[in-house]
Each structure stands twice: as structure tokens, then as C-alpha cells.
Amino acid sequence: ENSWHTDVTWMESPSLCSIAQCTECPPFGGDTLFSDSHAAFLGLPEKIKSQISTLSGINDYRVFLNRGGVQVPESLANEMKAQIPFGVAHPLARQHPETGKLALYIHGGFLRHDSLFDHTTGEAMGCEASKALVAELLKQHSRPEYQCRFQWSEGDIAFWDNRAVQHY
């Protein structure tokens, strides 16, 4: 199952960008949708924007693996466990380093949905409240007014800024 996401949020320093190339087009489907994370943030109710301005969540690749997101050979999984920290915190409202714009930064596959905390005080949000807020935020990128569709042709290359968009 696919979902709106930005790549490698489980890394301490997530990737700047991603690049994909179409070497063979399927007979139908296969489009990639992009959603503007800044517009998604701006579209939130003021109360939620204020609430998430100091909230961070723990992103962990193990959450994705435990949900059956991808099958990884045991040797690679062991190597990842040895090299990659057990969860990293990222703010839900993340400031783009070049534009200065705030963007909604959330990945439902890697985020521990019960892990939200105030990064100014260290105070954890309650488990149920955290899960409810995450569920609400995950809906935001699904709104068509923030999206564009890229229809692939053989040989096309797409390059995107993971700090500014999500893709599906």
C-alpha cells in the first residue's frame, strides 16, 4: 500500500532531494503525485498550526518494517540496526533552510504515531492525543488543492526537494 510520504525521514539528516527516472512505462497508471508541504501547513486551522509549532515526533525505520512495509534480508536488517539510530526526532512544522517557509513534515510509515512531544519542554503528548493529531495531519496532503500530477513518459527524469513536497 502506498501513502503520502517524503523520503528517509528516519535519518537524522534526511535527504535534500530524490531523483527518479522512467525506463519503462506501464500501459496505464504509474503517475506520481506531489503535494506542496508548505501549502499543506498553511491550510491547517490556526489552532493546529500553533499546536504543532513546538511539536516533534520520533521517526524510525523499524516502524515501517514492523508494519510489513518492505521485506529486507536479515543480513541487511542487522546491518541497518547496527548503523542507524533507533528513532530520530523531527519537528512536525519544519522550516525549509533556503526559503524559510514552514512545511508540514510528517511520514505516516516511519513516524511513531504515539511519540509526539514538545521540543521546547521535552513534555510528551498523551498517547491517544498524539495518535489523533497524527491521523488528522496525515489527511492534509490528500487534499487536491495542494497536489500536482506527473505523468511519466519513457526517459523522463523527476527531481524533487524532500524538504518541500511529499509524493505518492
Question: Can you name each region flagged by the protein language model?
Answer:
Residues 1-157, 163-168:
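Non-heme Fe(II) oxygenase catalytic core, chiefly the N-lobe of the double-stranded beta-helix
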